[in-house]
UniProtKB/Swiss-Prot annotation:
SUPFAM superfamilies documented for this protein: Class II aaRS ABD-related, Class II aaRS and biotin synthetases
Gene for this chain: hisS
Disulphide linkage map: none
Keyword ATP-binding: yes
Family to which this protein belongs: Belongs to the class-II aminoacyl-tRNA synthetase family.
GO cellular component: cytoplasm
Keyword Membrane listed: no
Record's catalysed reaction(s): tRNA(His) + L-histidine + ATP = L-histidyl-tRNA(His) + AMP + diphosphate + H(+)
Region (Disordered), start-end ranges: 412-434
Principal location listed in the UniProt entry: cytoplasm
Keywords for this protein: Aminoacyl-tRNA synthetase, ATP-binding, Cytoplasm, Ligase, Nucleotide-binding, Protein biosynthesis
GO biological process: histidyl-tRNA aminoacylation
Name assigned to this protein: Histidine--tRNA ligase
Documented EC number(s): 6.1.1.21
């Protein structure tokens, strides 16, 4: 017997039915904002993620050397891949570029609630504009997608920050000390809520801050008063505060400002983030970890050898999103749905298949017996797949040129002329023919 690998999951049809509904809602919402679907490879060069995603990613990669001696990895995230794609055809692509993609990713990390080694995300990205409305549109897409799933303002919140505020405050507090590892300090901020206070301060001191500097830095992060932050910081902070305010104003214009709160302790751990960053959380706190996050990464395209191209994106993950939806009671029902089951009795398959073909032409879900089962077994199967209507094609009925239509919810049934079904109805029900 072969066991399933730790951190990997099987999805049987009922669960996939619910997952497909959620993915469809995410992708449909993205389409309504003008995002176009792209497809991406499963393997990329290992070095691309080591170089672009930052410290710590290398130990999480499912990496190996292929038969050609190339170091490759199963992709752990999508942003470097879509950045490479933009560079490959940068001159031919109309700006702004708006892409969406849903696919699996792989990271060898600690398995816990809402976190697996194979996981699925819907990535939504905009390339080619630094206008704050682009950041706001990413936030608006995310908010609308969650609302379309049935969530409300009491269910989720976006905690919004700006990487330049963090780096500018670090520079101000340390008097532009060149020995400060700004990226390491920001990675420490990203871990702040997940580790003990002593460990967090230890990471800041490891990044070059003194104890007093680390304390002052952390005190500033806990304020949401942008006026105070602007007076304390340098010109970088002042500019970043203005940009963050512009994004929040645009978010208000798009009608989703109620979901956004300033939270300077939000940092995002990947090194390529540059400007506005945000994370989505369960507003009740019951789901403690971040549901998903995103932000601006204006330098990534240029670092791949392309023309300077601002970019911003978000990536809702299905695993943590399912926890939020289940907590709020809006996760889709995990059960099969079937429009019609055609039950055959005796040598009636030619008539049954004709009816099935005509119903399927109109996009109905139709099953027909393919196992030569008894009447009772077929009815039991129809019930197990939640068939709404059972069409009984029996030899005796056909002698009278009739078939039986049974409503599985009410149990009512009636006979109709076989040539009259399905007739002019795309999806005829018992009520249509009675």
């Amino acid at each position: 017997m072969y066991d399933r690998l730790k951190g990997f999951r099987d999805f049987y049809p009922p669960e996939m039915t619910a997952r497909r509904q959620v993915i469809d809602i995410l992708e449909t919402t993205a389409t309504q904002y003008g995002f176009r679907e792209v497809g991406t490879p499963t393997l990329e060069q290992t070095q691309m993620y080591v170089d672009k995603s930052g410290e710590g990613i290398e130990e999480e990669l499912y990496a190996f050397s292929d038969d050609g001696g190339r170091d490759v990895t199963l992709i752990p995230e999508l942003t470097p891949t879509v950045a490479r794609m933009v560079v490959d055809k940068q001159q031919a692509l109309s700006k702004p570029i708006k892409w969406v993609s849903t696919r699996p990713f792989w990271r060898y990390e600690q398995v816990q609630q809402g976190r697996f080694r194979e996981f699925y995300q819907t990535n939504v990205d905009i390339f080619g504009t630094a206008d704050p409305i682009a950041d706001a549109e990413i936030l608006a897409f995310a908010a609308d997608a969650l609302r379309n799933l049935g969530l409300t303002a009491s269910d989720f919140e976006f905690r919004v920050s700006h990487r330049d505020i963090l780096s500018g405050l670090l520079a101000s507090i340390t008097n532009d000390d060149a020995d400060i590892d700004t990226r390491a300090a920001i990675r420490a901020v990203d871990k702040r809520a997940k580790i003990e206070q002593a460990e967090y301060h230890g990471l800041l001191t490891d990044a070059g801050l003194s104890y007093d500097q680390a304390q002052s830095f952390d005190d500033l992060l806990t304020t949401a008063d942008l006026d105070e932050i602007a007076t304390v910081g340098n010109d970088i902070v002042t500019t970043a505060v203005q940009n963050l305010r512009s994004v929040l104003a645009a978010v208000d214009d798009l009608g989703v400002g109620e979901f956004c709160d300033i939270s300077l302790t939000t940092a995002r751990g990947l090194d390529y983030y540059t400007g506005v960053v945000f994370e989505c959380f369960d507003a009740t706190g019951e789901v403690s970890r971040s549901v998903f996050g995103g932000g601006r990464y204006d330098n990534l395209i240029e670092s791949f050898g392309g023309q300077p191209t601002p970019a911003v994106g978000v990536a809702p993950g299905l695993a943590p999103l399912s926890l939020l939806c289940q907590r709020a009671g809006v996760w889709p029902t995990e059960e099969l749905t079937t429009d019609y089951y055609i039950l055959t009795v005796g040598d009636t398959r030619s008539v049954a298949t004709r009816i099935a073909r005509e119903l399927r032409v109109n996009k109905n879900t139709v099953e027909i017996d393919i196992a030569d089962r008894s009447f009772g077994a077929q009815m039991g199967y129809a019930d197990s797949i939640n068939a709404e209507t059972v069409i009984i094609v029996g030899e005796r009925d056909l002698e009278n040129d009739e078939i039986t239509i049974k409503d599985m919810n009410s149990g009512d049934q009636t006979t109709v002329p076989v040539e009259a079904f399905p007739g002019d109805h795309d999806a005829p029900t018992y009520e249509d023919v009675v």
